[in-house]
Structure formats: C-alpha cells, structure tokens
C-alpha cells in the first residue's frame, strides 16, 4: 500500500473501533491519513484518534456533540461502517426495533453524509464510503431480515444520489455490500475483514470510481 496515498487527509471512520471499520482505519493511517475513529469500544491503536460514542444508546444525538461536529466539518475522508444487524421475520418485529434499525442503518449514515458535505464542497475534494448489506444494490425479498435489508437498500439510493449530485465538487461516494465475515453458510462464502477494507481503500483512492455499489460476497445470493 502506498504510504503517502492520503498524506495528511483528515479521515473519520464511524464504527472504526472494531471489525471492518478498524481495518479501514488502520489502512488509511498506513497510507498517511490522520484518522479519527468513533465507536463504543476504546481503541488501543496508537496511530488512531479515538472519539468514544455509543450509537446504540445515543443514536443521532451523538452527532450533535461539539467534538463530533468539529471533526465532521473538517473531514476529508469519511467511512461509515457502523450498522447493527437484526435477523427477524416481519411479524416478530416490534415498533421499537423498526425505529432502531431505521435510525441506525439509514438515518445515521445519511445524517453523517449531510454533515460532511458542506466542508468537502468548500474544499472541492472529498471521499465518502458507505456500507450496504449483502446484495442490497436492488430491491429484492429477504425472508428473515427485511428491516435491515430495507434500510441498507436505502443506503444504495444515498450513494447513487450523492455521487451524481456532488461530483462537480470533486467528491466521490461509493459503497461496499459485504458478505459474511463470520458465520457464513459455507467456507466458500467467507470474506476477510482486511480484504473488504482493501476494497474500500481502492474505492476511496480513485477519483474515477464514483457511485459504485461493490458486492464483496464471493457470489452469495439471498434465498
């Protein structure tokens, strides 16, 4: 990986204290970016700046904190990897669960994008990376996780809309739709977190890749 690819670029990874988000944060840092991570668990990685936040409890209110708003306004590279998964058939979903999934998996990434865009527009440069669900690039049926998949399908609309509307400002917006990083139905469909992160870095690094919905799932299809 090119050490100075993102030299000095202020970067924020929401959900960057674990999993794919942590791998993206570390790879950004290795490429010269100045990286902040937001998450519930404290990061032990010395090259990352930590902003502790609990979106499961605080929801969108975490974005209104002065320290968070300052980072969002300065952000040149933004990745939102946070997105809780819920597997339940529709008839078992409570109103509270519908609300939580809608906020956490759709409204929160959208609000983050709205917050970082003005600064990126002013600087005429920006990179946004969002995460959908497995095969949520189009409308399809999901038997046991309709709420989650519905919210993540909406993320694809945000990606396509931002990529079209803000490309004139030097801003790109792309998405990864990852497969199973654990508990795969079979070994052939298992993807490594570090590999998914590498695909994210590739999308961020190119000004010509814009509006991409990248299926990173070894060809798995929902049934």
Features from the language model and the residues they span:
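N-terminal Rossmann NAD(P)H-binding glycine-rich loop of SDR-like oxidoreductase domains
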Residues: 17, 25
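Rossmann-fold cofactor-recognition segment
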Residues: 46-59
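Conserved NAD(P)H cofactor-binding loop of Rossmann-fold oxidoreductase domains
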Residues: 79-87, 218-219
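Substrate-binding pocket helix/loop in short-chain dehydrogenase/reductase
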Residues: 89-90, 97-99
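A short, exposed helix-loop element centered on a Lys and neighboring polar residues
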Residues: 113-114, 160
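Catalytic loop of short-chain dehydrogenase/reductase
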Residues: 127-154, 159-160, 164-167, 180
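C-terminal helical subdomain
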Residues: 168-171, 175, 187-222
């Amino acid at each position: 990986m090119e050490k100075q690819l993102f030299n000095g670029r202020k970067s924020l990874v929401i959900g960057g204290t674990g999993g794919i988000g942590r791998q993206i944060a570390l790879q950004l840092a290795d490429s010269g970016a100045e990286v902040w991570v937001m998450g519930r668990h404290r990061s032990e990685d010395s090259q990352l700046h930590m902003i502790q936040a609990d979106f499961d409890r605080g929801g969108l209110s975490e974005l209104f904190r002065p320290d968070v708003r300052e980072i969002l306004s300065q952000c040149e590279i933004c990745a939102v990897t946070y997105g809780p998964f819920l597997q339940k058939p529709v008839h078992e979903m409570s109103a509270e669960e519908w609300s939580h999934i809608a906020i956490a998996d759709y409204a929160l990434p959208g609000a983050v994008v709205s917050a970082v865009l003005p600064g990126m527009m002013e600087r005429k440069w920006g990179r946004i990376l969002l995460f959908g669900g497995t095969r949520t690039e189009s409308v399809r049926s999901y038997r046991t996780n309709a709420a989650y998949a519905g919210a993540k399908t909406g993320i694809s609309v945000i990606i396509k809309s931002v990529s079209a509307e803000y490309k004139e400002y030097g801003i790109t917006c792309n998405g990864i739709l990852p497969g199973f990083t654990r508990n795969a139905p079979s070994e052939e469909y298992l993807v490594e977190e570090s590999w998914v992160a590498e695909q994210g870095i590739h999308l961020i690094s190119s000004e010509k890749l814009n509006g991409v919905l990248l299926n990173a799932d070894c060809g798995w299809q929902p049934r």
